[in-house]
Amino acid sequence: MNNSVTNTARLLWAGLRSLLVLTVVTGVLYPLAVTGVAQGLFSDQANGSEIKADGKVVGSSLIGQAYNLPLKKGQETPEPDLKWFQGRPANGLGTNSVNTQYSLILSGATNRSGDNADLIKWVKDAKAAVVKDNSTADHKVKPSDVPADAVTSSGSGLDPDISPEYADLQVHRIAEQNHLAVAPVQKLVDEHTDGRTLGFIGEPRVNVLELNIALKELVATS
């Protein structure tokens, strides 16, 4: 009997020691080590790839933002604020009442096929809107000028980047809306165009948030 109790106590004590050791290693030491390495070597990425303006965090370089006008009475979908560069559309994501700046809870693409009537209508309507919104008194946009990313959402619906072609398409409208010359606005786009990663991965791109921060500074100094 005594041996049975002793063996049981020994096993319980061994199990408790294992629990304590594993708790310290996996619950304290390992997280601290990973956090230390992340902060030491990849501080920017570990903190969410934050973008700051005037000393304040205004967003992440990994998540797109919407630049829309306030909803008017009776409207279900806000109109784009044409003073700012616009990102890719987010068709099919819907809306949520928890986070209105980013549709994070509803991220994802639609499941509609390429020949779906609703999707075809979305693309046609989006192209017509891009042509209308970006045509100015002295610069007319043709449907053939509209790049694919201007009328299609990304896989997540939260793409922070647009193609240089789509950014270039918006230059004349941005200049007109903000009472700027075209040349400095085009220069902003050129300065914020990133090439392919490592020279061969992906496509050239423009981060919309970073571009709009630079645009805000340009407007303030003009």
From Swiss-Prot:
It is found in: Cell membrane. The system is composed of three essential subunits: KdpA, KdpB and KdpC. Residues 136-162 are annotated as: Disordered. Part of the high-affinity ATP-driven potassium transport (or Kdp) system, which catalyzes the hydrolysis of ATP coupled with the electrogenic transport of potassium into the cytoplasm. This subunit acts as a catalytic chaperone that increases the ATP-binding affinity of the ATP-hydrolyzing subunit KdpB by the formation of a transient KdpB/KdpC/ATP ternary complex. It is a single-pass membrane protein. One of its GO terms (cellular component) is plasma membrane. It comes from the Bacteria. Belongs to the KdpC family. The gene is kdpC. It holds the Pfam family KdpC. The keyword Cell membrane applies. GO terms for molecular function: ATP binding; P-type potassium transmembrane transporter activity. This is Potassium-transporting ATPase KdpC subunit. The lineage of its organism: Bacteria, Bacillati, Actinomycetota, Actinomycetes, Kitasatosporales. The chain crosses the membrane at residues 13-35. Keywords: ATP-binding, Cell membrane, Ion transport, Membrane, Nucleotide-binding, Potassium, Potassium transport, Transmembrane, Transmembrane helix, Transport.
